[in-house]
């Protein structure tokens, strides 16, 4: 289409580093540059705007579930990086108190490893301001952004949608985390039993669903 694609070589070469470079270019060349963010993070109006566009996912999912089953699900799971995917499907069920909304973050090497991207499932994130918005970020005691890790590149990010921060504080959304090893095992399970090859990001949701189902069955 004629656009110039610039790869980012700084830092860990993750979404955080790409956003940093994008914002540097934007503020340097405002006369001929427009900043567009595809995830539900960043300064207003991006979180609200992206969430609204993504809401079609939840609207269609809710309609199709009712047509197929005649009832609403007990739980809705979605992987959470920046949060646009999860905001999309959750919005179809926000007004249904009987439906539990569960976000699945990247647990990486596990709790306590500091090699993960779990902002709300673990206790390592703190409220901060970065990249033009306020939310929970993975950061050190000096407020500098921490390095992150995940087997899934799409979930490897320091912050989370500020709307999710609010919903989590209000108890409207629950967050869990899946480790890299759990994701790899779940990926093989889904391929073997369902004949599907899900993305590593999506597989975080399968891990959480399977673990919670197993826990509920035991109870």
Residue ranges and their predicted role:
Residues 46-60, 199-204:
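A glycine-rich, Thr/Ser-enriched phosphate-binding loop motif common to dinucleotide/cofactor-binding enzymes
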Residues 19-49, 69, 98, 103-196:
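Active-site/ligand-binding loops adjacent to catalytic centers
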Residues 1-12:
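A glycine-rich helix N-cap at a beta->alpha junction
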Residues 191-212:
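C-terminal structured "cap/appendage" subdomains that terminate the fold
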Residues 72-85, 101-104, 215:
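A short, small-residue-rich loop immediately preceding and capping a beta-strand
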Residues 63-70:
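Phosphate/pyrophosphate-binding loops at sites that engage ATP/ADP/AMP, CoA/4′-phosphopantetheine
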Residues 80-90, 111, 202-209:
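Short glycine/serine/threonine-rich phosphate/pyrophosphate-binding segments
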Residues 213-219:
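Conserved small/polar residues in nucleotide/adenosyl-binding loops
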């Amino acid at each position: 289409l004629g656009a110039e694609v610039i790869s980012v070589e700084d830092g860990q070469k993750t979404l955080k580093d790409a956003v940093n470079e994008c914002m540097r270019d934007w503020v340097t060349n405002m006369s001929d540059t427009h900043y567009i963010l595809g995830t539900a993070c960043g300064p207003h109006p991006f979180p609200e705007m992206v969430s609204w566009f993504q809401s079609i996912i939840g609207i269609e999912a809710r309609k199709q579930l009712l047509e197929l089953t005649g009832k609403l699900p007990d739980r809705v799971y979605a992987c959470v990086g920046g949060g646009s995917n999860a905001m999309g499907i959750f919005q179809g069920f926000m007004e249904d108190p009987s439906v539990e909304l569960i976000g699945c973050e990247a647990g990486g090497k596990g709790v306590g490893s500091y090699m993960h991207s779990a902002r709300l499932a673990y206790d390592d994130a703190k409220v901060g301001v970065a990249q033009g918005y306020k939310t929970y970020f993975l950061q050190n005691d000096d407020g500098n952004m921490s390095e992150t890790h995940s087997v899934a590149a799409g979930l490897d990010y320091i912050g989370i949608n500020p709307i999710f921060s609010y919903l989590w504080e209000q108890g409207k959304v629950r967050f869990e985390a899946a480790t890299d090893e759990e994701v790899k095992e779940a990926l093989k399970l889904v391929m073997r039993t369902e004949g599907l090859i899900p993305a590593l990001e999506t597989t975080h949701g399968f891990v959480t669903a399977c673990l919670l189902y197993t826990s509920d069955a035991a109870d």
